[in-house]
């Protein structure tokens, strides 16, 4: 706007008749009356007419416009919200949550495989005809009953396993202990990392997981039965690079139940054949 006025004012002044009074209406809303007069002494004959210069009032108006620039632009309306940004990096693992509620009973499973053969008892020898009216016999020793019970227990099914972890694991996954040392009964599967019960009874399980640290993180390891956590252990990387997470349980298992160790965040050290991380269990006594 100021630039247009600076150009328009001189043009208006040039268009006015020389020596005549004129009026100017400027942007400052004031009227200026300033006649243009010829130079003293007139012009010599034959001299080329010179355009009149701007008046003093016009110069004052132009200086006033230069000193007071037009107001700034009016702020427009608020724009629409921008597009959502990209997802941020994945945060560290959170603390283990509490166990969930017990689920409803599952459907009845298929019939199990035939059980192991029972104990073979030897036939007793026939006794002679007793004497009528004989006296009472001497009481037997209770040690024989205890020995018989222990014999029946230890002569039952033999189920035990002891396995180690060769390759490292991290994140949230079932630990597949692939270094099998003992697997009586072949109830442990190294391809899945799970122990599958085939004989109902009371079992003992224990696990020891070495954390692969050095970056200030922690590791959680849970022993699960059919997806439900039955024991948990944590290892923290405080002042050292390695720490152990260990725990043990005694569980009653039915045929078809599965027991395994699940990593719930962190890094587990494998150790090739050194067996730094192990998982073992055995049958205490069958039902």
Curated annotation (Swiss-Prot):
Transmembrane segments: none annotated. Residues 154-287 form the C1q domain. One of its GO terms (molecular function) is identical protein binding. Residues 1-21 form the signal peptide. Residues 42-127 are annotated as: Disordered. Residues 76-118 form the Collagen-like domain. GO terms for cellular component: cerebellar climbing fiber to Purkinje cell synapse; collagen trimer; hippocampal mossy fiber to CA3 synapse; synaptic cleft. Forms homotrimers which can further assemble to form higher-order oligomeric complexes. Interacts with ADGRB3. May interact with ERFE. Forms heterooligomers with C1QL3 and C1QL4, when proteins are coexpressed; this interaction does not occur after secretion. May regulate the number of excitatory synapses that are formed on hippocampus neurons. Has no effect on inhibitory synapses. This is Complement C1q-like protein 2. It comes from Homo sapiens (Human). The lineage of its organism: Eukaryota, Metazoa, Chordata, Craniata, Vertebrata.
């Amino acid at each position: 706007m100021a630039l247009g006025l600076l150009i328009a004012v001189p043009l208006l002044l040039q268009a006015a008749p020389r020596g005549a009074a004129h009026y100017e209406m400027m942007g400052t809303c004031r009227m200026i009356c300033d006649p243009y007069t010829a130079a003293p002494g007139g012009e010599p004959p034959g001299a080329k007419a010179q355009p009149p210069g701007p008046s003093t009032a016009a110069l004052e108006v132009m200086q006033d416009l230069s000193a007071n620039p037009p107001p700034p632009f009016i702020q427009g309306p608020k724009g629409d919200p921008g597009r959502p940004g990209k997802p941020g990096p994945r945060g560290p693992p959170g603390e283990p949550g509490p166990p969930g509620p017990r689920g409803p009973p599952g459907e009845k499973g298929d019939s199990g495989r035939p059980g192991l053969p029972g104990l073979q008892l030897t036939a007793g020898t026939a006794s002679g005809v007793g004497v009528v009216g004989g006296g009472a016999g001497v009481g037997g020793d209770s040690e024989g009953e205890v020995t018989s019970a222990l014999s029946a227990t230890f002569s039952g099914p033999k189920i035990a396993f002891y396995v180690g972890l060769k390759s490292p694991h991290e994140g949230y996954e079932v630990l597949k202990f692939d270094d099998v040392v003992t697997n009586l009964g072949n109830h442990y599967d190294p391809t899945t990392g799970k122990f599958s019960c085939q004989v109902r009874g009371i079992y003992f399980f224990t696990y020891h997981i070495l954390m692969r640290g050095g970056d200030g993180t922690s590791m959680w390891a849970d022993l699960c039965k059919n997806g439900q956590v039955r024991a948990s252990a944590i290892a923290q990387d405080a002042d050292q690079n390695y720490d152990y997470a260990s725990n043990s349980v005694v569980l009653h298992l039915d045929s078809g139940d599965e027991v395994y160790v699940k990593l719930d965040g962190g890094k587990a050290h494998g150790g090739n054949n050194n067996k730094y991380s192990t998982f073992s269990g055995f049958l205490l006594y069958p039902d």
